[in-house]
Structure formats: C-alpha cells, structure tokens
Amino acid sequence: MNTYSPKDVFEQSRVAQLEQLPVTLYETPQAGALAVARHIADEIRDRQAKGQKFVVSLAPGRSTSDVYAELVRMYREEGLSFKNVEFFDLYEYYPLADDRLGNHAQLSRQLLDLVDIPKENIHNIPGNMPKEDILSFCREYEWQIAQAGGIDFQLLGIGRCGNIAFNQPGSSFISSTRLVVLDNNSREDAKIMFGSVDQVPVSAVTMGIDTILQAREVMIIAWGEHKSGIVRRAVEGEYNVSCPASALQHHKHTAVLLDISAAAALTRMATPWVVRSCEWDDRLIRRAVVWLCRQTDKPILKLTNKDYNDYGLSELITRFESAYNCNIKVFNDLQHTITGWPGGKPNADDTNRPERAVPFPKDILIFSPHPDDDVISMGGTFARLIKQGHNVHVAYETSGCIAVCDDEVIRFLDFVRGYADLGLLQGGDAYRKYEEYMHFLKDEKIGDQDTREILDLKALIRRGEATAACRYMGLETDHIHFLNLPFYETGSIHKAPLGDADISIVRKILEEIRPHEMFVAGDLADPHGTHRVCWEAVLAAISQLRETDAWQEWLSECRIWMYRGAWQEWDIDQIEMAVPISPEELRFKRNTILKHQSQMESAPFMGNDERLFWQRAEDRNHATAEIYARLGLANYEAIEAFVRYKME
C-alpha cells in the first residue's frame, strides 16, 4: 500500500486513524508548494469572478518560499492578478533597527513587491513603532482584520517547538495580536536572518492563536525530516498549550501539507503495522524488528513469538513461521552491513560485504558540500580509505565563505600585517589592504553584505583549513579539489538556483577521475539546503553522462554511498554500510575536525545544537554503535553509517 496516497477512503481512514488533523502528503517539497500555490491562485480567481476580495495572511520563511515563487511565476506567465487580494502580516520582529530585515521585508522580496497587489491593501506590522503605541496598534490591527471581513486564508509554517507565528509553547489558545518576548529557540531560529543571536530582536508583535483560528481556512505546511517530530506532536498529540499548533485540531477547515520527510514520524510512516496490514520488504522487516527490540528492551536473537504477537507483528510470524527465523534473517542482514573495508577487501569473498573486492585499489571521489562535511561526517572512513591504499580524491563543492565570522578574517589580517612588519613582505600593498579591510569590517552593519574581496579571504581561510585536515590524514594536495560552485557565491544565505555552470563543474571532475566509488552528502531533508543542492548537482551531472554511450560502462560499475552531516544519522533500517571506528581512530577524527578552527565556537551557522561539530560527530557515532550493540551485535566504540544510492 502507498502510505502517502491511499487508494480509497477506507485505506485513508485506516492509515490516518491516529491523526487529529487532515494530512496530505507529497513526494517532494516542490510538489507540495505547487499544490499550495495553485490552491491560493484558484481562490483568488474564484473571488475575482464574484467581484470579492480575498483576504490572506502568509508566513515567511524557507518552507513557503517555493509557494511564493510559483505565485510570482503565475502572475508573470499566466496573468494571475493580485488586485483583489488584501494582505495582513502574520508577525513582525520588534524592535527592528533596519527595515531591510524582518518578516515584512522578506515577504516583500519574495512576493509582495513582485506582483500587482495594491499598496493600500497591504497591512504590515511596523517593527519600529514607539513602545507606547504597541498596545493600541494591536487593538487597531484586530479591528482592521474585522473591517476586512476576516481572514479568508491563513498560511502557516510550524516551529520546532510547535509554535505557529510567534505563539510559543504556553501561549493561550484565546490570545489575540500582542507583543511577545521571544524565547531562546525562536531567537536561535532567526539568527540566520540577523547574522547572530545577539542581533535578533528580543520580542515580536504576532497574531494570536485565536486570531489565527478565526481564519476561514488554515493551511499549515512543513518540509524536511527536521520537522517530523513536531509534526507528529501537532497531528497525533494532545490538544495542549505545550504545542501551540495543536490548537488547529479544533479548527474546522485546517489542512496539513507535508512532504515524505516531514511525515516520517507519523504512525502511518514510522510504524505502519500499528494501523494496517503491510506489504513487507526487507527494509520494513528490519525496521519492525528493531522497533520491537526497543519496545521489549531485548536484543534481536532473544525476541520470542509472544513478543511479536503482543506488539502487533504476528504477520511476521506467519511469514517466517517462527520468531527464530525472522530474528536470524534480520540479525544477519545487520551483521552484513558491518565492514572495516569501506573500499572493499582485496582477495576476499565479497558476497555478503557492502563493497566489492575488485578493483583494488579503487579510484574514490568524496564530495563534500562544505569544506568540513567530509571529516565531520565520514572522517574515520576517509582516513581508512587512504590507509588501505585507495586512490582517494576529495571535491569541496562550495567555498563555505559565508560561514566564517569577521573575527577570523581580522586574525589573519593581523598575521599578514605582522608578517609585513617583520620585513618579510615587500611593498606597501599589505598595509593599504589591511587598512581598507579593517575599515570595512569595523563599519559593517547588520544586513550589509561582505565585499567580494572579504568573501574571498573567508573562502581562503576555509580552503587552508580543509587542506590542513587532508594533509593530516595523509592525502596528497593534488588530490584536493575546490570546485567553488557558482550557485553558492551570492554573499548571503540566499543562494542562486542550481545552474548549468554548477553542473558542468561537477561533470568535469567526474570525467577527470572516473571513480569506482563515490561518497556524497545525503542530507536531503532540507529543500533549500546547500547539501541538497550539491547532491542535485551530482545527480544532474551523472544524468548528462548517462546520455552518452561512452560513459554507460563506467556508471554501471560506479557505486555511490550517501553519508549524513552533523545534524542527524541514518535510521538503522536504512543503513547498508557501517564502518566501525576504534577509540584511537575516533581521536584521530576529532583532531582532523579541529583543523577547521573557524568552525569552532565562533562559527555563524552552528544551528540549534550548542555542541561543537566534533562533539556532535562523536556523539552520533557513539549512538550508532550503541544501537548495534543493543541489538546484540558487536560492541564498537563508534560507527559511521552509509546508505547506497542505486542508479536506475
């Protein structure tokens, strides 16, 4: 059964029996965004035909950006007019020191300034109003919404704690537009827009939950695996102020639109045997048995017929005739994922090994989206491939320049000036450039973009760190490739679309090396993340090569392994190659990561996790090894995990 597109009402009722909100699933974020945009366009046109206004409130952010891009396309190419649309801000940061920042500025760039919505139809929340005017403004804003006839359509995202707009956990379900103090999580989430947590305003003016609930139609969207946990709480959890989005369970016309990754934790996806009969394949069987081990706190080989029957897995007993047979199958499957030879073991039977024994040594290419993803995600495997004699190359796809703070640049500028002071650098350019760059960095304001020269300096810092890390592992410097894909080089967090120039660069490195084995970042959860775009560049390059007969043989022999980044790990049912790491190798991996000094405490994009990258990597690798041990397999210090990408 297709769990995200049930074939009839009966199947839908079965798979959704624990869901308190109506859910529609899409295979990709782009498909979901297209559906939302079409729905909004249909409503606009329907109201236009009736001579009516369409009153909307829209959420900003990366989740909704594709929706707005499609609406703009419809406006430009299909004649969709927004003249009958009346718009209300959902929230705004307060106080805003720069009107180029904030929610309304972002929405203006994404949609409002690009279509023909009349300026008088746009109701914004000023981020710079006097404090004494806030209370009266909030009352006036509610009155303006009422005068417009109420909100017809409300588009929402969902925060990692279940917040809708800036209604944070604990917010009253009868709250109206008001000033709220932002919690640490909300400020952490906003630091990408403002540059750092310290620059994020301490408060915001937001529509209240009751204001949102009064909208005639509410649509909440979420894309990406990082949203899956909170989506489950909102959809299947209790109606409770600890999860503000759960308030929508009592709204008559709410729809939840998710991609497969965001829906991953819903019962219908995570443990489908709880709500229906399953079409069992090897991966689902492994997932069910691992889940059963967690429920019973037993290793695989100690599970009994009673355990399977008590937890709703009697279908597996029927299929395998006994718990013993099922246990042995899953245990062996997991055992065969473990290998100390990620490039293949020469002169060995590779029937049950993840990677082939021949050819040996292999030409291996590691793609790293940023200059440190390789060592963070697979540093132990990287070092072992080199040690075992393979011809290893690494390709750093982007410069990573925007992830270097200004203090790092100043530190290197001071070094260059000191070098010149020692008389080791001839000419006056060093002093002149030092003063020029220092003046710029000193006067730079929030929202200002770095100059191209400053960005080049930041890229140079990261290039030096990556080279040092590779040298530490024993990789020859002529095997290090910096691709500097153009889509990344915008100077801001907003990247350009993947283009032909990016794909051409990736294709060239593939043609040059012709690897037998590739490692790529498989973090596909974020539809706009650099990792995903880099992966799409690799896929596009491969697709072009597959169209030429000369490359068919190479592609048929090339194996692609996906690793995950600093944020998450593959689920146990997905893992196809598990590379054990000894305590000594783990310390070596830590030292390799530490070569990336600019990405330690001062890195701008550490995410919501306070641990340093080497700590996250070690904790993740320890956790994977612990899972294997609890399932009854060998107890290793740490494990790096990979999933094979199979080309159709």
Q: Where is each model-derived feature located?
A:
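Glycine-rich N-terminal segment of FAD-binding domains in flavoprotein oxidoreductases
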Residues: 46-77
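Short, glycine-rich nucleotide/cofactor-binding loops
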Residues: 61, 366-375
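Short Gly/Thr/Asp-enriched flexible loops that form oxyanion-binding sites at enzyme active sites
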Residues: 67-73, 164-176, 528-544
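Conserved phosphate- and dinucleotide-binding cores of soluble alpha/beta proteins
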Residues: 2, 10, 20, 27, ...
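Structural motif
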Residues: 55, 86, 152-153, 217, ...
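Histidine-anchored nucleotide/phosphate-binding helix
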Residues: 67-78, 374-399, 403
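Metal-dependent de-N-acetylase/amidase catalytic core
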Residues: 187-195, 199-204, 296-365, 384-388, ...
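N-terminal glycine-/serine-/threonine-rich phosphate-binding loop
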Residues: 1-55, 349-351, 358
